[in-house]
């Protein structure tokens, strides 16, 4: 729980392609902030183009913590992110700077602020039962079953994501509690920081979809297929790994495997990215205490002023 003289921290949240990085860099230029990435794909090395990872020039000006920390063969979790982010926040605050947490992995934000209950270990029998049902009825039927018992998890997990669907339903079958109840079930912050929660949200969904399509085409021009081909050649990687299941990567992988042609791959990747943005916005709408920044009318100078006021209030020990 934050105390009157708790150090300040900033959350900058938003869907994919909403302009979070540009705004974060502007804040770093103007204020004593240091960026911590809140993104489940940016943690992976060798996955730069398809994740829209900031380039060397941006990173030189505004270093990001928690990017390029894992090999794509490794898995990352909300629990590990929370541990890593708390350590980074403490280091930044101890240096007299302000943690600026930027990203679109909303589960990570919730885990960081509200904590995580201990999840049950995997159960081979339950997993086999779910896999048998999926083999008989399809993963869409598993998704529908999950939606009946855990609507929030079903809203954020795509029907074509068997790994996460299986885990979410497994947790419910083992505990009688939905997975979403473990992910920060309370809305009382556990962080010892005075938080300002900013959310970039589009007023026009169609405009965001257009930005997503343009950005994916830019990724293709920059060499996304070659980047994924480098991963595809590795014998230790496969499409069931979390890194390869990232939006854009799984479609490019399927294209390289001969499962679809180029235009189908492009179309599916753009649609999947739009679906990701929709899920991110669903999470944002239910996130407590956010201040909405309208994406199309964004005034960076006004955001800098708002953050500066938050930092001054924190130093003075004034109210939130």
From Swiss-Prot:
<feature type="binding site">
    <location>
        <begin position="14"/>
        <end position="21"/>
    </location>
    <ligand>
        <name>ATP</name>
    </ligand>
</feature>
<feature type="binding site">
    <location>
        <begin position="16"/>
        <end position="21"/>
    </location>
    <ligand>
        <name>substrate</name>
    </ligand>
</feature>
<protein>
    <recommendedName>
        <fullName>tRNA dimethylallyltransferase</fullName>
        <ecNumber>2.5.1.75</ecNumber>
    </recommendedName>
</protein>
<dbReference type="Pfam" id="PF01715">
    <property type="entry name" value="IPPT"/>
</dbReference>
<keyword id="KW-0819">tRNA processing</keyword>
<comment type="similarity">
    <text>Belongs to the IPP transferase family.</text>
</comment>
<dbReference type="InterPro" id="IPR018022">
    <property type="entry name" value="IPT"/>
</dbReference>
<feature type="region of interest" description="Interaction with substrate tRNA">
    <location>
        <begin position="163"/>
        <end position="167"/>
    </location>
</feature>
<feature type="region of interest" description="Interaction with substrate tRNA">
    <location>
        <begin position="39"/>
        <end position="42"/>
    </location>
</feature>
<comment type="subunit">
    <text>Monomer.</text>
</comment>
<comment type="function">
    <text>Catalyzes the transfer of a dimethylallyl group onto the adenine at position 37 in tRNAs that read codons beginning with uridine, leading to the formation of N6-(dimethylallyl)adenosine (i(6)A).</text>
</comment>
<dbReference type="GO" id="GO:0052381">
    <property type="term" value="F:tRNA dimethylallyltransferase activity"/>
</dbReference>
<dbReference type="GO" id="GO:0006400">
    <property type="term" value="P:tRNA modification"/>
</dbReference>
<keyword id="KW-0460">Magnesium</keyword>
<keyword id="KW-0547">Nucleotide-binding</keyword>
<keyword id="KW-0067">ATP-binding</keyword>
<dbReference type="InterPro" id="IPR039657">
    <property type="entry name" value="Dimethylallyltransferase"/>
</dbReference>
<dbReference type="GO" id="GO:0005524">
    <property type="term" value="F:ATP binding"/>
</dbReference>
<dbReference type="InterPro" id="IPR027417">
    <property type="entry name" value="P-loop_NTPase"/>
</dbReference>
<keyword id="KW-0808">Transferase</keyword>
<feature type="site" description="Interaction with substrate tRNA">
    <location>
        <position position="105"/>
    </location>
</feature>
<feature type="site" description="Interaction with substrate tRNA">
    <location>
        <position position="127"/>
    </location>
</feature>
């Amino acid at each position: 729980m934050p105390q009157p003289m708790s150090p300040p921290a900033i959350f900058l949240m938003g869907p994919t392609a909403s302009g979070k990085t540009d705004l974060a860099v502007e804040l770093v230029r103007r204020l004593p902030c240091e960026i911590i990435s809140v993104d489940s794909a940016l943690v992976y090395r060798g996955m730069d183009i398809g994740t829209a990872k900031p380039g060397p020039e941006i990173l030189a000006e505004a270093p990001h913590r928690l990017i390029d920390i894992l090999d794509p063969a490794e898995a990352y979790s909300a629990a590990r992110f929370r541990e890593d982010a708390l350590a980074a926040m403490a280091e930044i605050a101890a240096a007299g700077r302000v943690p600026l947490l930027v990203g679109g992995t909303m589960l990570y934000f919730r885990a960081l602020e509200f904590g995580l209950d201990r999840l049950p270990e995997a159960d081979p029998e339950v997993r086999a039962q779910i896999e048998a049902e999926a083999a008989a009825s399809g993963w869409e039927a598993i998704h529908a079953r999950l939606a009946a018992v855990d609507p929030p998890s079903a809203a954020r997990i795509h029907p074509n994501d068997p790994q996460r669907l299986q885990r979410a339903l497994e947790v419910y079958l083992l505990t009688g509690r939905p997975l979403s109840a473990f992910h920060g079930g309370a809305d009382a912050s556990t962080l010892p920081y005075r938080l300002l929660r900013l959310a970039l949200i589009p007023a026009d969904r169609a405009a965001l979809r257009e930005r997503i399509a343009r950005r994916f085409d830019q990724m293709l021009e920059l060499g996304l297929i070659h980047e994924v081909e480098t991963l595809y050649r590795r014998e230790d990687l496969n499409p069931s790994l979390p890194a390869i299941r990232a939006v854009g990567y799984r479609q490019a992988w399927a294209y390289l495997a001969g499962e679809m042609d180029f235009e189908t791959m492009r179309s599916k990747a753009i649609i999947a990215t739009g679906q990701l943005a929709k899920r991110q916005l669903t999470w944002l709408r239910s996130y407590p205490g956010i201040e909405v920044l309208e994406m199309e009318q964004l005034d960076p100078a006004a955001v800098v002023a708002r953050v500066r006021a938050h930092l001054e209030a924190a130093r003075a020990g004034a109210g939130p």
